[in-house]
């Protein structure tokens, strides 16, 4: 019986291995992690991450051919294929700080694999890593191998949180990169045979190691680029009276462009986009390609601009001051159908409003209060490091931030409300009830274009929607730069 072990029980490792176990009942799959609370959660009825469909998959396989354990060395020792899905956060200090990927956890995992292994293994990069990381990992394994043969493969994930299980069931493609040697090709075939249990062979793409590693960074950079492009267009639409939704539809019907990732918003977030673009920028700079680096820098700059522009619009619309005013924040996760708050635009918007002395009342259906408070108190880039290493700001935010359990409580007596996550439930709220319980004039700032602005204006709201023609009230406010 083939045994697969995955080091790292996070957003990638857990769901990926759960689906692999479901589709390959004859293969034993073990997910290991040094975090005992996380493993205990995977073995409980309350999983550590929220993902539609994940709970059903885990329940079908757990205890049969899917296991979760803190005994990392034991299961690595017993496995034939080892997936490494540990964090590769952005470095916070030293060479490349703020851009380069921190491979500390990856190197530690590689050294442990070499130390405990007594038989040949296929080691699979599942984490997103800089191009040519496999070469460094190969050297670590080879120099510590004690004669054992290791084959390194790159098998990047292309999951979207909120649809991860669907993406795993029906992937656009599976990408496997390996060495162009007999042993390397044999390793590629072994992993391809695993995926072929449910993925059509023609959708399994095999490349060299470096192409696979760079393809993941490129895919995320291209997606983020589209978001920044439409967000830059949203600013121009507001200035000219055009409607970004109509512009995006007209552009997206061009078959060369397509409609996906053309929804204007308050900005992109999540664990990958910004981190991977910063990594790509650093790689370009290290390879003497400043023009290429500057191109990708602009994608991040536009994203930051969009968040600042939104927060400034809130302040300027409300008589240029939000000091002491209650503002409801609807949605804190970086997108709907996930509890993930990593790099969510809500953090920057909330912190900017707090800096202007606003009082925030925050509601998100999946994000816990502890997480929200930690995010608003944390130094940048620390979110992807272990909790003991996270630096929390000395100044507290408790007096200005209140986390509540429903949207109606959040909006009661508020001067304005900001929609920062596109949760479906926000579309069906009783906005007449909300309006009646808010201070007047009552403002809605829709950062996701999910509410019906026409109906809200009929109720009496002053509405700002990203990239849409401005209310006459908003046109009279100071320009937002």
From Swiss-Prot:
Q: Which residues bind substrate?
A: 157-161, 216-223, 256-269, 334-335, 448
Per its UniProt entry, what is the enzyme's top EC class, as one word?
oxidoreductase
What is a biological process (GO) this protein takes part in? Answer: UDP-glucuronate biosynthetic process
Q: What is its EC number?
A: 1.1.1.22
Q: Which residues form a coiled coil?
A: none
What InterPro entries has UniProt attached to this entry? 6-PGluconate_DH-like_C_sf, NAD(P)-bd_dom_sf, UDP-Glc/GDP-Man, UDP-Glc/GDP-Man_DH_C, UDP-Glc/GDP-Man_DH_C_sf, UDP-Glc/GDP-Man_DH_dimer, UDP-Glc/GDP-Man_DH_N, UDPglc_DH_euk
UniProt keywords (A-Z) are: NAD, Oxidoreductase
Q: What organism is listed for this UniProt entry?
A: Arabidopsis thaliana (Mouse-ear cress)
Q: Which family does it belong to?
A: Belongs to the UDP-glucose/GDP-mannose dehydrogenase family.
Q: Does the keyword NAD apply?
A: yes
One annotated GO molecular function:
NAD binding
Record protein name field: UDP-glucose 6-dehydrogenase 1
Pathway info: Nucleotide-sugar biosynthesis; UDP-alpha-D-glucuronate biosynthesis; UDP-alpha-D-glucuronate from UDP-alpha-D-glucose: step 1/1
Q: Which PANTHER family match?
A: UDP-GLUCOSE 6-DEHYDROGENASE 1, UDP-GLUCOSE DEHYDROGENASE/UDP-MANNAC DEHYDROGENASE
| Residues reported in the UniProt entry to bind NAD(+) | 8-13, 33, 38, 86-90, 127-128, 161, 272-275, 342
Described purpose of this protein according to its UniProt entry: Involved in the biosynthesis of UDP-glucuronic acid (UDP-GlcA), providing nucleotide sugars for cell-wall polymers.
Induction or repression = Specifically induced by H.schachtii (cyst nematodes) in nematode-induced syncytia.
Spell out the reaction equation it catalyses: UDP-alpha-D-glucose + 2 NAD(+) + H2O = UDP-alpha-D-glucuronate + 2 NADH + 3 H(+)
Q: Give the phenotype of cells or organisms lacking this gene.
A: No visible phenotype.
The organism's superkingdom is given as: Eukaryota
Task: Describe regulators of its activity.
Answer: Inhibited by UDP-xylose.
Q: Which residues form the active site?
A: 272
